[in-house]
Amino acid sequence: WGACEFCRRGEPTLCVDYHVLGEHVPGVHAEQIAVPEDNLLPVPEGVDWSTAAAAPLVFQTAWRMLIERGDLSAGESVLVLGASGGVGHAAVQIAAHAGCEVFATAGTAEKRAYAAEIGADHTIDYTEDDFARAVRAETGGRGVDVVVDHVGADTWDDSLRALARGGRVLTCGATTGGRPQTNLDRIFWNQLQVIGSTMAAPGTAERA
C-alpha cells in the first residue's frame, strides 16, 4: 500500500490514490496478469474458480459494510434492498448469520423465494408494495435498525422512512444515481446515521 495516513493505518480504501483493478486499471480480462501480492487471495480447497472469482468482491464488500462499518449486532433488524443481486444476496446471508431479523426486497416471486432460502425472514415485492410502509407494518410501526441501500436515488428517501429512530442506513453504491433528494428533517429529528463503505480493507477476507 501507499504511505498516506490511511494506508499507514490499514485503510487503503480511504486513500486519495485508491484504484480498483478492472475499474480504474485495465487488463483484468486477460488470461494472465501480474498484480501485487497484496491483491491476491488463496483459493480454499473445494472452491471452484467461478465461485472464487465472484465471491470475494460481493462478500468482502457486504462484510465490511455491515460488520466493520455498520457495527451490526445480533438481535437487530435489517432491511436489504436488491436482495437477489451480488452485494444484496451477500448482505442477506451475513445479516442472517449475525443473528439479525432480515427483511429483503426483490422484484419477482422467484427472487423473493431465493432471498428466503438464503436467510431472509420477510420478503417484500418492491414492484407492488411501498417497502418502507411494508417494513413499518411488519414492525408495529417501529421500522428497522439498519437499511442496506446500494440502489441510490430511486430508493433513498424510502430507505430513511423505513428506519427506526436512531437507525442507520449503509450504502456502498448508487445504481440509480448518486444525487438523491434527502429529507434532512428526518435524519436529524430521528437521529439517523448515514454510513458509507467502499470495497474492503486488508484482512477483511480472513475475518469474514
PLM segments and residue spans:
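Mid-domain Rossmann-like dinucleotide-binding core that forms the NAD(H)/NADP(H) cofactor-binding site
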Residues: D48-D129
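Glycine-rich helix-loop-beta junction characteristic of Rossmann-like nucleotide cofactor-binding loops
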Residues: E68-S73, E138-G140, R161
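Short, glycine/polar-rich helix-capping loops at beta-to-alpha or helix-loop-helix junctions
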Residues: V28, A106-Y114, F131, R179-L184
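Glycine-rich phosphate-binding loop and adjacent beta-alpha segment
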Residues: A98, A106, D154-A208
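N-terminal Rossmann-like NAD(P) cofactor-binding module of classical short-chain dehydrogenase/reductase
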Residues: I124, D145-V148, L170
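Short amphipathic alpha-helix with an adjacent loop that forms part of the alpha/beta core around
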Residues: D130-G141
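NAD(P)H cofactor-binding loop motif with strongest signal on the N-terminal glycine-rich segment
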Residues: A83, V151, A174
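Glycine-rich phosphate/adenylate-binding loop and adjacent beta-alpha elements
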Residues: W1-L40
